[in-house]
Regions:
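Hydrophobic residues within well-ordered alpha-helices
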Residues: 140-141
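Glycine-rich acyl-CoA binding loop
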Residues: 106
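GNAT-family acyltransferases
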Residues: 1-103, 116, 120, 161-176, ...
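Flexible ATP-lid and adjacent glycine-rich G1/G2 motifs of the Bergerat
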Residues: 113
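Conserved GNAT acetyl-CoA-binding A-motif
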Residues: 119-129
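Conserved catalytic-core motifs of GNAT/GCN5-like acyltransferases
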Residues: 147-161
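Conserved beta-strand-loop-alpha-helix junction that forms the acyl-donor binding cleft
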Residues: 128-137
């Protein structure tokens, strides 16, 4: 599965193809692992093993995020909890390196995954969940058009700590409007000569409601 956009390509995560680039992107940034199930990778070999585990994971599809500007992997994301019988899939285990955070490529990557889930795989419900204390992830979900559904208290134990999970969703009946907002935001005319957005994604979505 390869998803291509104007500013980014998502391709199957591969230890052979992506370890070196991802190590350069995340090395020394242990804070990136705070909210993930994985512990920080202290060496490139540790990162390779982590990626190999993700390649072999059952019930999940991990994709490397490769910005067109550099051609080098700068993060990953996955489809999880895929339940075709119920039409439900989750996007999760998202790792954005500092170079990928707050970029057009990062937003387009999330758009491409949502579009593939709804338009090509035919899912009815697209989920996002995170540690309830992870405020940046909660803000990101809302910016991307997910609806907050509530808190699952004492939902998991992660790294020895109890976790409450915040749940968000997007439905197929909502996707057409979300898609229009994404595509309007991604238009080259929405960015100035230095790549700064003229209108935010939330502004565009609100104007279309």
């Amino acid at each position: 599965m390869t998803l291509r956009g104007r500013t980014v390509t998502l391709e199957p995560l591969s230890a052979e193809s992506h370890t070196a680039d991802l190590w350069k992107a995340v090395r020394g940034h242990d804070e990136l692992w705070t909210w993930l199930f994985d512990s920080p990778c202290g060496t490139e070999a540790d990162l390779r093993r982590t990626i190999e585990e993700k390649q072999a994971a059952r019930g999940a599809v991990f994709l490397a995020i490769v910005p067109a500007e550099t051609g080098r992997a700068a993060g990953w994301a996955s489809y999880m909890r895929m339940e075709p019988a119920h039409g439900v899939v989750e996007v999760g285990s998202i790792l954005f390196s500092p170079s990928l955070q707050r970029t057009t490529a990062a937003t387009e990557a999330m758009y491409l995954m949502a579009s593939h889930a709804f338009d090509h795989l035919g899912y009815r419900r697209y989920e996002w969940k995170c540690n309830a204390q992870n405020l940046p992830s909660r803000r990101a979900a809302e910016r991307l058009g997910f609806t907050f559904e509530g808190i699952f208290r004492q939902h998991m134990v992660i790294k020895g700590k109890s976790r409450d999970s915040a749940w968000f969703s997007m439905l197929d009946s909502e996707w057409a409007a979300r898609k229009r907002a994404f595509e309007a935001w991604l238009e080259p005319t929405n960015f100035d000569g230095e790549g700064r957005q003229r209108q935010g994604l939330g502004q565009i979505a609100a104007a279309q409601d």
